[in-house]
């Protein structure tokens, strides 16, 4: 059933790292989970975080560390770190705890599914042909070194009366193979005809069990 499930959740702990790194007992777990959701929702609404691909939340001795993964770190940091300081203060008021904000730069945005999906969605909002946007994105992904890529758009494409889905695929995207490092993300474009959904799958290659073990140990010792 690899075709039906989320590729990220399907591979978490195998080739994908957890996006929330903390432990909570029965009394704390629900509270921590709600805090994580509020933090992510707040960051997604910030203009400085519009180009962010993801957020990792860590907790340690009453403090929260949020790592923002972005291809444009300068936009998140702001002039002389003003934006980061503002984020820290807003998150401190939101959670009532001390919050650290770290910035992780994405070196190759063409291989990040979230950034690719957001780029396609923004082009569709600017009335660029969805087929042109999809084909251009696929070309950039493959030229960046991906093994395979699949892109799907759904909705009232080009203003059609009946909603439909169209997809393009290039290379190999084995969703059933757990050792395959598949990056997956969704985005939505708000058009005058309604919402257009965008899904992107990118095959970054295969990871061996040894690589997985070292990746897991790196997470536990990082920062």
Swiss-Prot record:
Q: Name one GO biological process term.
A: translation
Answer yes or no on keyword Ribonucleoprotein: yes
Q: Does the keyword Cell membrane apply?
A: no
Please give the superkingdom of this protein's source.
Answer: Bacteria
Q: Listed GO cellular component terms?
A: cytosolic small ribosomal subunit
The molecular function GO annotations come to: mRNA binding; rRNA binding; structural constituent of ribosome
Q: Where is the KH type-2 domain?
A: 39-117
Q: How does it assemble?
A: Part of the 30S ribosomal subunit. Forms a tight complex with proteins S10 and S14.
Instruction: Please state what the protein is called.
Output: Small ribosomal subunit protein uS3
Species the sequence originates in: Chlamydia felis (strain Fe/C-56) (Chlamydophila felis)
């Amino acid at each position: 059933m690899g075709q039906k499930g989320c590729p990220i959740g399907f591979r978490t702990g195998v080739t994908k790292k957890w996006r929330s790194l903390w432990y909570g007992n029965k009394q704390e777990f629900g509270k921590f989970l709600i805090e994580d959701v509020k933090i992510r929702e707040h960051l997604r609404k910030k203009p400085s975080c519009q180009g962010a691909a993801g957020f990792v939340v860590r907790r340690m001795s009453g403090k929260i560390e949020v790592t923002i993964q972005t291809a444009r770190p300068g936009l998140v940091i702001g002039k002389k770190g003003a934006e980061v300081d503002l984020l820290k203060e807003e998150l401190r008021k939101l959670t009532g705890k001390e919050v650290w904000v770290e910035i992780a730069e994405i070196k190759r945005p063409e291989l990040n599914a979230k950034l690719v999906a957001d780029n396609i969605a923004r082009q569709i909002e600017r009335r660029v042909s969805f087929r042109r946007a999809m084909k251009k994105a696929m070309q950039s992904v493959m030229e960046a070194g991906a093994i395979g890529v699949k892109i799907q758009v759904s909705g009232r494409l080009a203003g059609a009366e009946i909603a439909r889905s169209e997809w393009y695929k290039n290379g190999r995207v084995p969703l059933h193979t757990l050792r395959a490092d598949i990056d997956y993300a969704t985005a939505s474009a708000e058009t005058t005809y309604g919402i257009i959904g965008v899904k992107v799958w990118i095959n970054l290659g295969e990871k061996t069990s040894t690589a997985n073990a070292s990746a897991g140990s790196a997470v536990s010792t990082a920062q």
